[in-house]
């Protein structure tokens, strides 16, 4: 089973190139691939891409080169084109492509259940509510999973108690853009999930690679980076990422629990969509298997405070409970991001 980061395919030409390059990499053919579909499958290349991200329908073609492809939908850009959510879900069902991360209209949710090599799995998807509340769906009643982290933890535990033979994986859309380190709260949440028996915790959204750690024999990948989000197409062509965002990693988990890391270069300067750099064990990957993974909670809080990238009047989440303090921090983040969006959108509109 192979987990990949954020994917946004702007048009059929890019989709065909990506699929051809994936095939040439030689690591996808016999895999169940789980990838974050960053943005809806759009029925046509949209003309309005101002501050929006989507996927061309050529993304469906991934199923032709993999044993199975599964799309994670719990991300904020699904709300960029709300009118396309139901057509997307219908298309995925028609194409027999499993997906997860969509909530019921009342906010309740269930994992995707499937079988792999005789082993039963369940995958939970979740998006940090800061992002769904700064990019709201005001057009339809479709919802992605964005409950509080405390509720997510409790619901995962309830599910595991009622499904004791099933291996559970959590696929989480969290953290700030370009933040290299997970919040201390994310460490605690991931550790608590593993302590209760979750098989793996996989994170996305930061658009850069983050730490990967082995905790009690289970893998936690806090951020896989951009699997494929090419520069110069989205946000009316203005969305571009720094060089470090063009390196990404795929985490392969075998039925026996073995871990391989597939390191890729994506959207390369020479025009390739994807190139395989190397495949290594986690123990061989010193860049991602970082010393701070061995820190205790207090030491990591100090490390994060000193080394975090996002600093300007930005709160730190040290716990994931529903405390008043965390609710205030969350509300402040929502206010700050909304204010920044308004200012940047005003600037960008007048530069078009």
Locate the predicted segments by residue:
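N-terminal active-site segment of His-dependent metallophosphoesterases
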Residues: 1-54
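Active-site neighborhood of phospho(di)ester-bond hydrolases with catalytic His/Asp-centered motifs
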Residues: 3-5, 32-38, 68-76, 99-103, ...
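Active-site environment of divalent metal-dependent phosphoester hydrolases
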Residues: 10-13, 41-44, 76-89, 105-111, ...
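A short C-terminal boundary segment appended to hydrolase-like catalytic domains
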Residues: 11, 238-352
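Binuclear metal-dependent hydrolase catalytic cores centered on His/Asp/Glu-rich metal-binding motifs
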Residues: 11-23, 115-168
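Active-site-proximal segments of metal-dependent phosphoesterases and phosphodiesterases across multiple
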Residues: 44-65, 166-198
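Conserved beta-sheet core of the metallophosphoesterase superfamily
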Residues: 67-70, 184-249
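Extended active-site neighborhood of metal-dependent phosphoesterases/phosphodiesterases
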Residues: 70-142
